[in-house]
Design a protein with these regions (language model features):
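Acidic/histidine-rich catalytic neighborhood of metal-dependent amide-processing enzymes
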Residues: 1-66
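Metal-dependent amide/peptide-bond hydrolase catalytic core
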Residues: 68-230
Length: 230
């Protein structure tokens, strides 16, 4: 389409932005947005992010906060299990707490009716730990995430979960061995998108798409980063 844009003799330029590693945390676009915000003048008026929406006009998506947790236990023979600290079992308690948070949010909200899933979600993915059935596992690692609607702070949910580990689980673990406990690493933070249906770019895209409706999606895109930082 670039040659067609040039043929039109446009008074307002159209910028094409290409990024990499969107699927693993929107990594590539961050430096591009910083350059866009600081070096390109005049600043572009609006941004359209292409996603597979069947031409549905999307005005919002959830933000994503993802983390890896490492539970450090104390290895022992399973016949002496009370003398060890079972990293897998403490990880399971923490994961069960995350599930409890998910149930609470599903019941109490907050809610946004434009989403198919109208509330923030909490999810645990990959879990690894243990070496053999007759050995109390000394390590367990797992990844979890919060996908948040606008106005629901993913960082505060993460801090709530960490408090549970620090206040409820670690004291019991450290009674047996002081070196045991939980550590957390942030994997990625993808900002959510939340637009007013009356914004100029929304009206333009609806005209281009030939439709009047709009919606929000649960998956993340680079659009939230453009909205916040560009």
């Amino acid at each position: 389409y670039a040659p067609k844009f040039l043929e039109r003799g446009l008074n307002i330029p159209i910028h094409l932005a290409f990024s990499h590693d969107e699927e693993v945390g929107c990594i590539g676009v961050r430096s591009l947005i910083a350059k866009l915000a600081n070096e390109i003048q005049p600043k572009p008026m609006m941004c359209i992010v292409g996603e597979p929406t069947s031409m549905e006009v999307i005005i919002g998506h959830k933000g994503k906060h993802s983390y890896e947790c490492h539970v450090r236990g104390l290895e022992a023979h399973s016949s002496l299990a009370p003398q060890g600290v079972n990293a897998v079992e403490y990880a399971a308690e923490f994961i069960a707490h995350l599930k409890g948070m998910a149930r609470r949010i599903r019941k109490e909200g907050p809610f946004d009716d434009l989403y198919d899933i109208k509330h923030t979600t909490v999810h645990t993915g990959v879990v690894t730990g243990g070496t053999a059935l007759n050995i109390v596992p000394k390590d367990c690692r797992f990844e979890f995430e919060f996908r948040c609607i606008a106005g629901h702070d993913g960082r505060s949910l993460y801090e709530e979960a960490v408090r549970y580990a620090r206040e409820e689980l670690e004291p019991e673990m450290k009674l047996i061995d002081a070196s045991t406990g939980f550590s957390f690493e942030e994997l990625s933070v993808i900002e959510g998108l939340d637009m007013d249906p009356g914004e100029e770019v929304v009206t333009l895209v609806k005209t281009l798409a030939g439709r009047n409706d709009h919606a929000k999606v649960a998956f993340g895109t680079e659009a939230g980063l453009f909205q916040q930082d560009a």
